[in-house]
């Protein structure tokens, strides 16, 4: 993702380059990064920035730091792209998207079309037909000729390529060609990589001029009026006590004169949370994926089940917004361990502290919980998925 430009054509009273200016409540680059982070097929993101922008960049992408590798670019787009490709090389990707950081409105359906079209021989280029009449003018602004726009298209990004081929193309161009290429498909054409075009998206604008911010703000406002696909799942689990020396809650070992009875480690909190996460995909419950009768799960850590649910969500392009767990028990006391439990969930879920709630209550001495025969857990999870709620 290229974000090393200075954005001088965009003009502004603000001192920051266009990719760091606010679009709504977030910088432009934040919107762009989010589009790729939400797609399950994107495994690594290299963000190429201007050497002077590291501090402002890190502030802008706080929400996505764990998803990005920052690389400093060069004096030209071509040099910056090559540095990004070199940084990506160690990950041995099969394909690579090359995208302008100032295009913040990439839709999931465009990425899907690119992924189903690209192959090991050809690159993929989203394009839009040119509709305006084109004129060639001279230095004094006199019209020289009218250019027929039949078969003329404007190129967009992301452009997708077989990684090794586009890397070789950029390296060859840097070594032997003095021509300055304006996009990566031009380098691919020069190198002999066939480019397959697909229909682009008229909303996938590149913010180049100051007026483009007005267009972007209007489109963002329209998008915010859509109904986002936000799903909530609930989970419930209960385990009885048996003789033991400790029990596991939220992955944390708690010294106690009893343990929770179960086929796995009987982590009642993780079981409830796993079911809540699975519910956002209509994916059944833990027992659907991990049969209680299967000996391989005997005494297994419940984090395995939780991470399985996380992978299902990731494959669907989901992002967890928050989780809430309520433990219902007369004993042991949960308070002394709540902070450690929360930290463990922060690491597993990659969520900040304010997006995780763990609390405990008693059952006021009523029922089996009141008789100190076991522990119950309730969990709620909110997950955001790409797209809108179907009409």
Swiss-Prot record:
Its EC number is 2.7.7.60, 4.6.1.12. It catalyses: 2-C-methyl-D-erythritol 4-phosphate + CTP + H(+) = 4-CDP-2-C-methyl-D-erythritol + diphosphate; 4-CDP-2-C-methyl-D-erythritol 2-phosphate = 2-C-methyl-D-erythritol 2,4-cyclic diphosphate + CMP. It comes from the Bacteria. Its cofactor is a divalent metal cation. 4-CDP-2-C-methyl-D-erythritol 2-phosphate binds at residues 237-239, 263-264, 285-287, 361-364, 368, 371. The record marks 149, 206 as: Positions MEP for the nucleophilic attack. Residues 231-391 are annotated as: 2-C-methyl-D-erythritol 2,4-cyclodiphosphate synthase. Keywords: Isoprene biosynthesis, Lyase, Metal-binding, Multifunctional enzyme, Nucleotidyltransferase, Transferase. It holds the Pfam family YgbB. The keyword Nucleotidyltransferase applies. This is Bifunctional enzyme IspD/IspF. It comes from Bartonella quintana (strain Toulouse). The lineage of its organism: Bacteria, Pseudomonadati, Pseudomonadota, Alphaproteobacteria, Hyphomicrobiales. The gene is ispDF.
């Amino acid at each position: 993702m290229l974000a090393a430009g200075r954005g001088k054509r965009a003009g502004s009273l603000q001192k920051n380059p266009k990719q760091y200016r606010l679009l709504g409540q977030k910088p432009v680059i934040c919107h762009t990064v989010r589009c790729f982070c939400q797609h399950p097929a994107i495994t690594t993101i290299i963000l190429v920035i201007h050497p002077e922008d590291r501090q402002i960049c890190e502030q802008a992408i706080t929400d996505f730091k764990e998803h990005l590798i920052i690389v400093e670019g060069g004096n030209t787009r071509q040099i910056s792209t090559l540095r990004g490709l070199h940084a990506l090389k160690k990950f041995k990707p099969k394909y690579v998207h090359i995208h302008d950081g100032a295009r913040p409105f990439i839709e999931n359906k465009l990425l899907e079309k690119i992924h189903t079209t690209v192959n090991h021989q050809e690159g993929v280029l989203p394009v839009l037909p040119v509709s305006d009449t084109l004129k060639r003018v001279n230095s004094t602004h006199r019209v020289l000729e009218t250019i027929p726009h039949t078969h003329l298209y404007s190129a967009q990004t992301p452009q997708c390529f077989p990684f090794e081929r586009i890397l070789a193309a950029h390296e060859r161009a840097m070594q032997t060609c003095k021509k300055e290429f304006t996009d990566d498909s031009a380098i691919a054409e020069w190198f002999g990589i066939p480019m397959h075009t697909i229909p682009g998206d008229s909303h996938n604008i590149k913010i180049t001029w100051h007026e483009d911010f007005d267009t972007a703000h209007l489109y963002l406002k329209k998008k915010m009026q859509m109904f986002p696909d936000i799903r909530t799942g609930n989970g419930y689990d209960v385990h009885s006590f048996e003789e033991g020396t400790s029990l596991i809650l939220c992955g944390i070992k708690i010294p106690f004169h009893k343990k929770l009875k179960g086929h796995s480690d009987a982590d009642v909190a993780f079981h409830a949370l796993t079911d809540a996460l699975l519910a956002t995909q209509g994916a059944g419950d833990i027992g659907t994926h991990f049969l209680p009768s299967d000996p391989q799960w005997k005494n297994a850590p419940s984090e395995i089940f939780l991470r399985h649910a996380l992978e299902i969500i990731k494959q669907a392009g989901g992002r967890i917004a928050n989780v809430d767990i309520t433990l219902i028990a007369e004993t042991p006391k949960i308070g002394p361990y709540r902070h450690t439990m929360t930290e463990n969930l922060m690491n597993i879920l990659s969520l900040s502290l304010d997006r995780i709630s763990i609390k405990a209550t008693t059952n006021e001495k009523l029922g089996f919980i009141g008789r100190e025969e076991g522990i119950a857990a309730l969990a709620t999870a909110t997950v955001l998925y790409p797209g809108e709620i179907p009409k």
